[in-house]
């Protein structure tokens, strides 16, 4: 007996299911990588590595790794230079300034307080995107963002968390979600549609490294003996996270990408529990559930 379901229809159905899970997987993967790197950055500045080195050297290492990948694949050519303006602004807004602000702020802030401010990234993105993407903004997307923010705040604003920090450090940390949001919007609106994601990630990181490396202590040959390993690990994680970022940017907008901030917060607090021995709380359990609801609402909203 012949099947009543045409192969092409079945294939489209399977592809549709795959696309539904694709965005949440990107959000969770990128958010987890970024959260681990924030924890490593906190550790790096704690053992005495200068904040500017923590912000820039892993970025340069990630650029080298991605450039090496392009050379091995034979994909490095003159066309990579076409998008230099994109490399400059996407890198400044979404990478260099947030990295510098976060490493300087983490000298004084604990990870929980810093996580509160990272959680503001979706809110700033929502505010920045209103003039440009109002047609794609639905009540389910807005609700998804709000639920995600509540999830992150539920684990960072509990009475057990110490949030007494210098105002200067809080002000610097506030720059992180503001510039991350601006970077989200710029990348989505200026994204070169046919560009290779690896080329974009490598080009952006390389240009930013050329700008900022002269300001690091590495140019003078000054290294913390036990800091090389953590910076190398951060470089590897950064390379993977930026590669995933540009792949994800092809299928989402600034609002969609902003959901990464919620994952960063929840995963960051989870790392605090395992690394610093903080207790497993009901707030964290509730946050994970709310985060899943947030991702579902946003990724199943009709434009």
What is each of the regions a protein language model found here?
Residues 53-64, 93-94, 99-141, 176, ...:
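Specific alpha-helical transmembrane segments that line the substrate/conduction pathway
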Residues 27, 82-90, 137-149, 169-170, ...:
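Cytoplasmic-side transmembrane-helix entry/capping segments in multi-pass membrane proteins
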Residues 2-6, 41, 46-97, 124-125, ...:
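Transmembrane alpha-helices of multi-pass small-molecule transport proteins
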Residues 31, 56-57, 113-120, 186-208, ...:
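Helix-helix packing/entry segments at the starts of transmembrane helices
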Residues 33-38, 70-113, 118, 154, ...:
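Specific transmembrane alpha-helical segments of multi-pass solute transporters/efflux pumps
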Residues 2-57, 162-189, 211:
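Glycine-/small-residue-enriched transmembrane alpha-helix faces in small-molecule transporters
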Residues 19-23, 48-56, 79-85, 157-178, ...:
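Juxtamembrane helix-entry segments on the extracytoplasmic side of multipass membrane proteins
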Residues 66, 88, 128, 137-159, ...:
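Hydrophobic transmembrane alpha-helices of multi-pass small-molecule transport proteins
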